[in-house]
């Protein structure tokens, strides 16, 4: 069962249900991408043996033009969006379903399984600012934002 709620704004009933194992979501779909820190939520999700499904994994298209991601992409023969998607799927218990408006974009989104980001790439990405939210749903932002 998927979920679209975060641990910061969850109702007591939802958290109690998970604690009692009456209801266990399989995934929590939230905004997650290279420019948004979700470490607290990821830790909670992993502790509950769930998955995080990254919503807006390309930051509403902003990552396609990110110079650092373009540079890493050139190193691997990929584009910036492929680097961003690869970064997500290299993480434990993280999945993503990126939007693609054309057949070519869908093809590119699937062409991320033939390379891996190395430690240098991951360290470079880790140094980026991680406070940029692009999905603005009033009342849905977690309490820790």
What are these regions (language model features)?
Residues 1-145:
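Beta/alpha (TIM)-barrel catalytic core signal, keyed to glycine-rich beta->alpha loops juxtaposed to Asp/Glu
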């Amino acid at each position: 069962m998927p979920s679209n709620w975060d641990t910061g704004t969850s109702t007591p009933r939802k958290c109690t249900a998970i604690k009692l194992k009456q209801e266990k979501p399989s995934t929590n779909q939230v905004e997650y991408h290279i420019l948004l820190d979700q470490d607290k939520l990821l830790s909670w999700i992993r502790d509950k043996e769930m998955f995080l499904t990254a919503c807006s994994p390309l930051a509403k298209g902003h990552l396609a033009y990110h110079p650092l991601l373009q540079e890493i992409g050139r190193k691997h023969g990929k584009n910036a969006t492929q680097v961003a998607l690869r970064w997500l799927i290299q993480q434990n218990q993280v999945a993503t379903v990126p939007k693609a408006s054309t057949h070519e974009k869908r093809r590119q989104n699937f062409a991320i399984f033939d390379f891996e980001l190395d430690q240098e790439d991951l360290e470079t990405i880790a140094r980026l600012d991680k406070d940029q939210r692009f999905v603005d749903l009033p009342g849905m932002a977690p309490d820790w934002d």
